[in-house]
UniProtKB/Swiss-Prot annotation:
Keyword Plastid: no
Function: Thiolesterase that catalyzes the hydrolysis of S-D-lactoyl-glutathione to form glutathione and D-lactic acid.
Biological-process GO terms, alphabetical: methylglyoxal catabolic process to D-lactate via S-lactoyl-glutathione
Keyword ATP-binding recorded: no
The entry's keywords: Hydrolase, Metal-binding, Zinc
Cofactor note: Binds 2 Zn(2+) ions per subunit.
EC number per UniProt: 3.1.2.6
InterPro entries: Clx_II_MBL (IPR035680), Glyoxalase_II_hydrolase (IPR050110), HAGH_C (IPR032282), Hydroxyacylglutathione_Hdrlase (IPR017782), Metallo-B-lactamas (IPR001279), RibonucZ/Hydroxyglut_hydro (IPR036866)
Organism: Leptospira borgpetersenii serovar Hardjo-bovis (strain JB197)
Listed name of the protein: Hydroxyacylglutathione hydrolase
Catalytic activity: an S-(2-hydroxyacyl)glutathione + H2O = a 2-hydroxy carboxylate + glutathione + H(+)
Organism phylogeny: Bacteria, Pseudomonadati, Spirochaetota, Spirochaetia, Leptospirales
PANTHER family associated with the record: HYDROXYACYLGLUTATHIONE HYDROLASE, HYDROXYACYLGLUTATHIONE HYDROLASE GLOB
Homology family: Belongs to the metallo-beta-lactamase superfamily. Glyoxalase II family.
GO molecular function: hydroxyacylglutathione hydrolase activity; metal ion binding
Length: 269
């Protein structure tokens, strides 16, 4: 599967993704923000667009739909609850469905509520091995999505603890936004001795701003992303979270409670 990440220069630092099946040449856009930007990319390749998928209903993930449907007549997929909310979405996808499927590669749909209740993520599988995951606003580099606009932090905790914690470490993470530097600073505000976060922040500082972006895998995320450490937080992380969260809200050795506490702290940070 060919994967192309397009930085949109949007106020919320959105990413759009273009995926192309290497066997069938079918092409998909995930979370199109700017239809003209995507058309320009496709024209440069001499490609058309077969499918759109919106991970959820928020406008910054769907604003390119109308222009792309008008140009290419492509099919628009979404979570079943997104039909009627997402422009031009007509084809619902449920957990376990597939897109861009061929003999060697496919995208598997995950039902991932929390940021909103009609959110899906996509797991890229090649030669029967998970290779990458497209997470929309469920998980970011070194962070997770907020729950301010139609979500629930307890549901998000359940989604991430049950569906993402068990995934293989080699899987690459492709989120819906570039929030890495900000999220690393949040990690270090609670866990200032986290050497992996320090090194990753230094790595970010050497990149060309708005041109180059780090791609992390889940192995790195488990080191730099506090939301992936809720089952085994470091002593320093646990101590600093406990200082800021009332005792009655932070239950001992409860990953869900710790996750919700982190999400609350991130909301206020």
């Amino acid at each position: 599967m060919e994967v192309f990440r397009i930085y949109t220069n949007s106020p919320l630092r959105n990413f759009t993704y273009i995926l192309r099946n290497s066997e069938t040449s079918e092409t998909l856009s995930i979370d199109p923000y700017d239809s003209e930007q995507i058309e320009k990319f496709l024209d440069s390749k001499g490609w058309t667009l077969d499918f759109l998928l919106n991970t959820h209903e928020h406008e910054d993930h769907t604003s390119g739909n109308t222009g792309l449907v008008q140009r290419y007549g492509c099919t628009v997929y979404s979570h079943p609850e997104g039909i009627g909310k997402i422009p031009h979405a007509t084809h619902p996808l449920k957990k376990g469905d597939f897109l861009l499927r061929s003999s060697k590669e496919y995208l598997e749909i995950l039902d991932t509520p929390g940021h909103t209740f009609c959110h899906v993520c996509l797991l890229l599988v090649e030669n029967q091995k998970p290779k990458a995951i497209f997470t929309g606003d469920t998980i970011f580099n070194a962070g997770v999505g907020n729950c301010h606009h139609g979500g629930d932090p307890e549901v998000l905790a359940k989604t991430i603890l049950e569906q993402f914690y068990p995934l293989e470490e080699e899987i690459l993470l492709y989120p819906g936004h570039d929030y890495l530097e900000t999220n690393l600073k949040f990690t270090l505000s609670l866990d200032p001795s986290n050497q992996d976060a320090i090194r990753t922040l230094e790595e970010c500082s050497r990149l060309s701003k708005n041109v180059e972006f780090l791609t992390t895998d889940l192995r790195k995320e488990r080191k730099i992303n506090t939301f992936f450490q809720c089952d085994k937080p470091s002593l320093e992380l646990r101590k600093n979270v406990s200082k800021k969260i009332p005792f009655k809200q932070l239950l001992d050795n409860d990953p869900t409670s710790f996750f919700i506490s982190l999400r609350s702290l991130r909301d206020q940070w």
